[in-house]
């Protein structure tokens, strides 16, 4: 899986892999908090403020903040319960921008 990377660091819920000058973050999403953290890190990496992302999505800045904080709604709660009970692993990844 990681054979073509220069450096791989694996933690319990995420990995950081480096190839050339690019860094890729790969996270296992077990709950809404982890999902929010990945979204936040990706947004920051892309240079967006919460307000800018909200405008792109057509939602309020508060909605983006709540998503990044892992605020659970009924749908999110059910989604993670279904994933847990069915043994499904949800993962997310993003790569740093070119310098």
Language model feature labels by segment:
Residues 31, 63-66, 79:
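Residue-level recognition of specific faces of alpha-helices
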Residues 3, 37-52, 56, 81:
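Short basic helix-loop element that most often maps to the first helix and adjoining turn
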Residues 58-72:
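Recognition helix of helix-turn-helix/homeodomain-like DNA-binding domains
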Residues 1-34, 89, 94-99:
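N-terminal flexible/basic segments that precede or flank functional cores
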């Amino acid at each position: 899986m990681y054979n073509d990377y220069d450096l791989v660091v694996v933690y319990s819920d995420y990995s950081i892999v480096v190839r050339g000058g690019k860094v890729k973050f790969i996270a296992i999403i077990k709950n809404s908090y982890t999902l929010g953290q990945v979204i936040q890190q990706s947004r920051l990496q892309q240079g967006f403020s919460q307000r800018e992302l909200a405008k792109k999505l057509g939602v309020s800045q508060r909605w983006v903040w709540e998503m990044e904080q892992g605020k659970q709604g009924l749908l999110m709660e059910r989604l993670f319960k279904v994933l847990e009970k069915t043994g499904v692993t949800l993962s997310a990844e993003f790569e740093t921008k070119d310098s």
